[in-house]
Design a protein with these regions (language model features):
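Cytosolic regulatory regions of ion transport systems
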Residues: 160-161, 167
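ADP-ribose/adenylate-binding Rossmann-like module
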Residues: 168-192
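Residue-level detector of alpha-helix initiation sites
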Residues: 113-114, 159-160, 184
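Segments forming oxygen-rich coordination pockets for charged ligands
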Residues: 1-136, 143-147, 227-235
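Active-site capping/gating segments
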Residues: 200-230
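Short gly/pro/ser/thr-enriched loop/turn and capping motifs at secondary-structure boundaries
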Residues: 138-140, 183-188, 211
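Rossmann-like NAD(P)-binding element
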Residues: 145-160
Length: 235
């Protein structure tokens, strides 16, 4: 089977499912998986920025090229220029469709309250994919799944619960781990984790945030996210 560039008009049923208004003219590129280089899938799983160029003969896909940061210099000028913008974007040309996929930072906030809400609001403003999780069992799974592109922020006055969340973040690969709370809370968490044979806390920023004499929830959120941005940029 060959890939196709499809033109459809969204009907009422499709609008209900997709959220796209009824009557919208939409274009979809459908390409069989075997048209892609096998290395494409590991790159997408690892959330590596890539550019996909589907070459067209009218509406039929004739070839698919995939570029990453190491090979984008060999792409055509339009693809390289779109990739250089550093954001997910798409362009449709008569002879090809260019799809640039840039991963979005995931931010998991384990805790609740005004500070968590302020961090979530500012994180969303940054364009990050934000999850505020209050249930410990859900937080542990999310924290452990983070990548070096992502950030984890731990808060809470209950030592065992917040320590479990901190331990889960350390098990994952989050590029930034921030722990809110006093120095005493930081030590209490460190002691709890030590009983679990977790002693390397070098990746943890605690108390989290840069020193701007923050006091309000929004100021604290700015302080913490500024530190997170700086650390993620290093990665």
């Amino acid at each position: 089977p060959t890939g196709r560039l499809l033109n459809i008009q969204v009907n009422e049923f499709e609008a209900t499912i997709s959220g796209i208004p009824t009557g919208t003219n939409a274009q979809f590129l459908v390409v069989p998986a075997d048209h892609f280089d096998p290395d494409t899938w590991p790159a997408m799983i690892d959330r590596v920025p890539i550019a996909i160029v589907a070459h067209l003969d009218q509406d039929e896909v004739t070839r698919v090229d995939v570029f990453d940061e190491s090979s984008i210099s060999t792409a055509d000028a339009q693809t390289a220029e779109l990739f250089a913008e550093g954001a997910t974007a798409y362009e449709i040309h008569p002879d090809r469709v260019i799809s640039v996929l840039f991963p979005v930072t995931r931010l998991v906030v384990a805790g609740q309250g005004p500070i968590a809400d302020a961090i979530a609001d500012l994180g969303s403003t940054l364009g990050w994919n934000v999850s505020v999780v209050m249930r410990n069992d859900l937080a542990i799974g999310l924290l452990a799944s983070l990548s070096p592109l992502d950030a984890a922020i731990i808060m809470g006055h209950e030592v065992e619960m917040s320590s479990r969340n901190l331990g889960a973040a350390l098990e994952g690969n989050a590029g930034y781990i921030g722990a809110l709370g006093s120095m005493k809370m930081q030590q209490d968490r460190a002691d709890w984790l030590a009983y679990q044979d977790v002693t390397d806390l070098s990746r943890v920023f605690g108390p989290a945030g840069v020193d701007i004499s923050a006091s309000s929830p929004v100021e604290i959120a700015i302080s913490v996210l500024a530190q997170a941005i700086a650390e993620l940029k290093k990665n």
